[in-house]
Amino acid sequence: MMKLGIQMFSVKNMLMEDPIKALKAVSEVGYKYIETAVMPPQPGQKPDLGIGFGLPAAQMKQLLNDYGVKAIGSHAYYPDMEVMKARLEYQKEVGVPTIGAAASFFTDEDDVKRQCETFNKLGEMSKQLGIRFYYHNHFHEFQKMNGKTVYDIMLENTDPDLVFFELDTYWAVRAGMDPVSVMDKLGKRLIMLHQKDLPADYNLAINLFDGIIDGNESITMNTFMGLFMANPAHGQAFAEVGTGTLPIQSYIDKANELNVEYIVLEQDFTKRGELESITYSMEAFKKYKGVE
């Protein structure tokens, strides 16, 4: 049975204002497992060498203990290997067992393969400290390059003992994929799910490659952000768990079949208040079988 966690990006406004207050609020809603979000530094800032709270490791460990929360992973961006090394050492001290690439963008197949070499190196560095490295997808990893999806190229060119995956089911659907089939392909390399829902009243193409994004062009961060900033219908195409159209129980069933340990709420956008939103999803998760 999967444990329910939350990606702290779900309360991003609170997180940016006061990360410790955000952690306390999330714990009071009832979330006992968190995946942290380490934001890229602003110009002139040094990168965060921890898990996004700006605290020394010993203090971070105590804070998690005080709130009765376990950090199960972290999302981060990696400017260089030295930053990665520092973060891994921090996580080892705090007791965070996984570290993830929040996103990456790819210009062509050769670029995918080059980045896979980096992922393998990050995976090896992580493994040496008893930590697992994983990749979190959006929709663009299912773009095809020379007849294969970026995701398949990644699977073929990363070491299954070093690089694992966190499947965001929503984003897979937005690329025209069946998350259950993707989970079957991942097998034991799948270690977490990300879950949200697709609004029932969303009336544009669900598959973003169906006339919204040109799958023949390279997809950059600007492409990605521009899509959602330019059209509110895209930017607001997220719903609380259980309020939309995704067959979430089928995802839970398959993940449990594969012995996936965590299903993690990630609410990219909400029309509700952040705490109201994550509380609603918390209650909705209780209605599904196979989640505790």
How would you describe each model-predicted region?
Residues 1-98, 283-292:
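N-terminal pre-domain/capping segments
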Residues 6-8, 36, 74, 101, ...:
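Conserved beta-strand positions
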Residues 18-21, 48-59, 83-86, 110-118, ...:
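Alpha-helix N-cap and loop-to-helix initiation/capping positions
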Residues 33, 40, 70-165, 174, ...:
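Active-site acidic/histidine proton-transfer and metal-coordination neighborhood
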Residues 126-239, 245:
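Acidic/histidine-rich catalytic cores of soluble enzymes
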Residues 192, 261-268:
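Conserved active-site loop/cleft motifs that coordinate metal ions or position small ligands
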Residues 227, 240, 269-292:
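Aromatic-rich peripheral "rim/lid" segments of glycoside hydrolase catalytic domains that contact
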Residues 243-256:
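A short, acidic, amphipathic alpha-helical segment used as a generic capping/interface helix at domain edges
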